[in-house]
């Protein structure tokens, strides 16, 4: 999964959850009838072929709505698209004399006209490749934004045997998440080890939390402390079906062995599908929020209220590890149970015109101490929450630095072939107007997990949080 595919997954989650984000400024509208893009009114219809007209619509959609469109050099998008086109020709053993990049002047409309003319001349000579060339061209143009919240969702296939709640893949999680391995590898640190056995081939092979993965398909996951592309093979997505060979070490016994795992569907633990889980830990309310889906803040607050009934709590531990984000509105609502009258986040244009996301002061204050657990899987709206907790001194963060994937809330746009383009209309900053994207939010107490912790079922970050609340 590339950065684009990670963003695509986020876009799909956004659409499935009907998450609303601020309406973007129109800026420059599309240049022709039918070229204006708009948020989808509902689920898209059947997907049709990607054509040069769809690429044109996406090009002007970006220039009219992307948060930095006013300062964006559109020639970079066209150049990236043309590079991808010529590379795809080469991969298919073809080339076309007319496939030469036209001179671009910086006039967005004129440059598009020049690009389109050459594109049509090129693709007309290879009609059998027309669909492939269109797809790679648009993919490259979106990727040229270099934005972890920009994506183009298309050709999404689902395993025909899939049922709601099924897991798919090898059936494991490691200390390097799928998003880190494929789109944010710089944040990964060795060793690579199993943290959760979810089911599927991994469970059948007898792997356990704490097992160290020494190689993936014969390649080391880290070289000189830096992650390699081999880790991505742990997270195949349908229709990827090639077996994955792992070399493993169980440190408690010294055993080394190899297994070959085949991706597939598997039944997941129903508890793992719950967005909000809670339990009482002595006199502390522990609440895990896996994502900021609609109504997640209300569910979390109801859980705390239930745990508080008939007893005095000494505080709240909010576990946001692995929370991939969701609605910034939900994040702000949950924050509002701990502080009122504050700016929690800023959404800005490229010229630094910003609007704040305020606390919802209709939410009743809990009046309880707060500790938040974070890790590199805490992304987007989760980082909005974590940065506000730290900046506004609402509580303390324990664990590891967050993902650094907070470009801004994704706004979806429906293209004419029923595919979905998504990108931020405004850029996100923390409560102190600091940059979080690509950097993440540092914890107040750095408590990483180890293979030994995973093997023994220990949670050192949670233990630290409970200790802090009991001081």
Model-identified regions with their sequence ranges:
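Bacterial signal peptide processing site
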Residues: 20-22
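Bacterial N-terminal signal peptides that target proteins for export
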Residues: 1-10
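Extended, small/polar residue-biased N-terminal targeting/export presequences
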Residues: 52, 67-186, 243-245, 251-273
């Amino acid at each position: 999964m590339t950065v684009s595919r990670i963003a695509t997954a986020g876009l799909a989650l956004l659409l499935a959850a009907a998450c609303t984000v601020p309406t973007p400024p129109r800026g420059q509208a599309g240049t022709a009838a039918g070229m204006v893009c708009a948020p989808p009114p509902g689920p898209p219809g059947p997907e049709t072929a990607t054509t040069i007209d769809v690429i044109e619509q996406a090009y002007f959609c970006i220039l009219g709505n992307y948060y930095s469109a006013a300062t964006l050099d559109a020639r970079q998008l066209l150049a990236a698209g043309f590079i991808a086109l010529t590379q795809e020709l080469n991969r298919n053993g073809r080339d076309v004399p007319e496939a030469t990049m036209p001179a671009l002047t910086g006039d967005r409309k004129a440059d598009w006209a020049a690009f389109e003319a050459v594109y049509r001349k090129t693709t007309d000579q290879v009609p059998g490749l027309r669909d492939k060339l269109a797809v790679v061209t648009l993919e490259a143009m979106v990727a040229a934004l270099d934005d972890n919240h920009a994506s183009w969702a298309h050709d999404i296939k689902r395993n025909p045997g899939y049922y709601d709640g099924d897991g798919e893949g090898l059936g494991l999680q490691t200390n390097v998440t799928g998003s880190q391995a494929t789109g944010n590898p710089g944040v990964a640190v060795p060793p690579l080890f199993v943290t959760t056995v979810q089911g599927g081939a991994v469970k059948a092979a007898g792997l356990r939390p704490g097992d160290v993965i020494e190689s993936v398909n014969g390649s080391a996951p880290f070289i000189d402390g830096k992650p390699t592309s081999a880790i991505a093979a742990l997270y195949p997505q349908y229709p990827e079906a090639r077996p994955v060979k792992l070399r493993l070490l169980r440190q408690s016994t010294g055993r080394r062995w190899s297994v070959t795992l085949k991706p597939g569907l598997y039944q997941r633990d129903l508890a793992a599908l719950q967005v909000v889980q809670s339990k009482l830990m002595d006199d502390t309310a522990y609440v895990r929020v896996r994502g900021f889906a609609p109504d997640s803040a209300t569910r979390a607050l109801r859980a705390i209220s239930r745990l508080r009934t008939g007893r005095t709590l000494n505080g709240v531990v909010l576990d946001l590890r692995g929370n991939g984000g969701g609605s910034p509105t939900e994040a702000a609502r949950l924050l509002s149970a701990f502080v009122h009258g504050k700016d929690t986040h800023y959404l800005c244009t490229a010229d630094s015109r910003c609007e704040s996301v305020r606390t919802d002061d209709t939410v009743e204050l809990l009046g309880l101490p707060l500790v938040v657990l974070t890790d590199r899987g805490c992304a987007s709206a989760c980082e909005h929450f974590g940065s506000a907790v730290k900046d506004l001194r609402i509580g303390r963060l324990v664990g590891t630095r967050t993902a650094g994937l907070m470009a801004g809330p994704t706004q979806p746009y429906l293209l004419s072939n029923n595919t979905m383009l998504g990108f931020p209309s405004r850029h996100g900053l923390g409560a102190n107007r600091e940059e979080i994207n690509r950097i993440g939010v540092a914890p107040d107490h750095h408590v990483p997990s180890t293979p030994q912790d995973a093997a023994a079922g220990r949670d050192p970050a949670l233990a630290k949080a409970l200790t802090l609340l009991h001081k």
